[in-house]
């Protein structure tokens, strides 16, 4: 019957109940200690906070990188820039139209992930920004409607 007793002990909850009771007592003691500590502290504590600007909005930390991709794999470095919280200006004059569209599609997914924006600022030139940048104004009125991209 030693085998039966061993199996019974393995599936028995007697030890589990013992440990659960110990944990309950410890948590009760910890709660009592924390209430004693908080009651000895003053009720009204004045906390001063300094107004901090987010890292992306601080003009000293904001960067805009210039990219002129020549192959599709250059899109990874542009995406890394955006994911790092920095803006990029991308000039597609050195790449064919099909590759430029693929890169724009890739960057569109990256921008969607960080809730950013892509803005066309010239013929074959785009401004790509994460959500920490704000773009105001439009340049599309000055661009040709049937031009590249």
Swiss-Prot record:
This is Cell division protein SepF. It holds the Pfam family SepF. Keywords: Cell cycle, Cell division, Cytoplasm, Septation. Residues 46-57 have a biased composition (Polar residues). It comes from Leuconostoc mesenteroides subsp. mesenteroides (strain ATCC 8293 / DSM 20343 / BCRC 11652 / CCM 1803 / JCM 6124 / NCDO 523 / NBRC 100496 / NCIMB 8023 / NCTC 12954 / NRRL B-1118 / 37Y). The gene is sepF. Cell division protein that is part of the divisome complex and is recruited early to the Z-ring. Probably stimulates Z-ring formation, perhaps through the cross-linking of FtsZ protofilaments. Its function overlaps with FtsA. Belongs to the SepF family. GO terms for biological process: division septum assembly; FtsZ-dependent cytokinesis. It comes from the Bacteria. GO terms for cellular component: cytoplasm. HAMAP family: SepF. Homodimer. Interacts with FtsZ. It is found in: Cytoplasm. Residues 25-41 have a biased composition (Low complexity). The keyword Oxidoreductase does not apply. InterPro entries: Cell_div_SepF, Cell_div_SepF/SepF-rel, SepF-like_sf. Residues 12-57 are annotated as: Disordered. Residues 13-24 have a biased composition (Acidic residues).
């Amino acid at each position: 019957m030693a085998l039966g007793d061993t199996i019974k002990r393995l599936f028995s909850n007697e030890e589990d109940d013992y440990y659960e009771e110990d944990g309950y007592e410890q948590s009760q003691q910890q709660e009592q200690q924390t209430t004693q500590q908080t009651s000895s502290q003053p009720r009204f504590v004045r906390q001063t906070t300094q107004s901090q600007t987010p890292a992306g909005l601080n003009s000293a930390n904001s960067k805009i990188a210039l990219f002129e991709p020549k192959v599709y794999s250059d899109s990874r470095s542009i995406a890394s820039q955006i994911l790092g919280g920095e803006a990029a200006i991308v000039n597609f004059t050195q790449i064919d139209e099909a590759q430029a569209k693929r890169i724009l599609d890739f960057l569109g997914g990256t921008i969607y992930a960080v809730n950013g924006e892509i803005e066309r600022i010239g013929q074959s030139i785009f401004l790509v920004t994460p959500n920490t940048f704000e773009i105001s104004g439009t340049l599309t009125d000055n661009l040709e409607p049937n031009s590249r991209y």
